[in-house]
Amino acid sequence: MGAMAENLLVLCTILAARMALAAADDWIPATATFYGGNDGSGTMGGACGYGNLYDQGYGLENAALSTALFNDGAACGQCYLIVCDTDKAGRWCKPRGAVTVTATNLCPPNWALPSDGGGWCNPPRRHFDMSQPAWERIGVYRAGIVPVLYRRVRCWRRGGVRFTVGGFDHFELVLVANVAGSGSVAAVSVRGAGTGWLQMSRNWGANWQSLAGLAGQPLSFGVTTTGGQYILFQDVAPAGWKFGQTFSTSKQFDY
């Protein structure tokens, strides 16, 4: 991406944030810190199970959510537009700063610290522990923590939805990633060559499980996002698939 395109993208993000601020009721107060180092390498992996965030299409604009936001993994993949609250911490906010992040991890509570003195992710606090590169789009490094305003926004992804089939023997653990629209998944079903549609259950994060023992069968998936859109992904994995393989599709969600 050229410098002009990058500048245009930043400008569009900022304009979207500032225009949206006019509808103040849509914005929710929270706080934000950062982790993972200045290169963001420490944010790879995480409680959503995405692993390498570059490979899965999320990159460094990511965040770990406090328990109140993470919702036992149901928020994995959701996108949030975040701006620094200049009314509360003007000198610690970057001018015209705004960033959109994807939920990729859980920021666990720290019960050894008070919620207003280091236990930023303790319930019922709404808190984003962002990658440092993303956080520095909105806050001055020395601040460490800033008050923010956030709102859910539509996720934009390159390419189609991806399925990684993990597990062993009669246990399939399927990671659903690179989801646009709502970003998060509400339900997944799977069908083999010799079965009807089987409802899968969330195992952890963005991983969905089945105990049907479908090894050796071509796999199709039906996915419903939290926005209510359903897409059928026909014959995603061929009969000879192996555990650990990732399959990309050409279909993508709008909401």
UniProtKB/Swiss-Prot annotation:
Stretch forming the signal peptide: 1-24
Membrane topology, record value: Peripheral membrane protein
InterPro entries, A to Z: Expan_Lol_pI, Expansin, Expansin/allergen_DPBB_dom, Expansin_CBD, Expansin_CBD_sf, RlpA-like_DPBB, RlpA-like_sf
Keywords carried by this UniProt record: Cell wall, Cell wall biogenesis/degradation, Membrane, Secreted, Signal
One matching Pfam family: DPBB_1
Compartment(s) where it occurs, according to its Swiss-Prot or TrEMBL record: Secreted, Cell wall; Membrane
Residue ranges occupied by any Expansin-like CBD domain in the UniProt entry: 170-249
Role, per record: May cause loosening and extension of plant cell walls by disrupting non-covalent bonding between cellulose microfibrils and matrix glucans. No enzymatic activity has been found. May be required for rapid internodal elongation in deepwater rice during submergence.
Family: Belongs to the expansin family. Expansin A subfamily.
Name of the protein in its database record: Putative expansin-A27
Biological source species: Oryza sativa subsp. japonica (Rice)
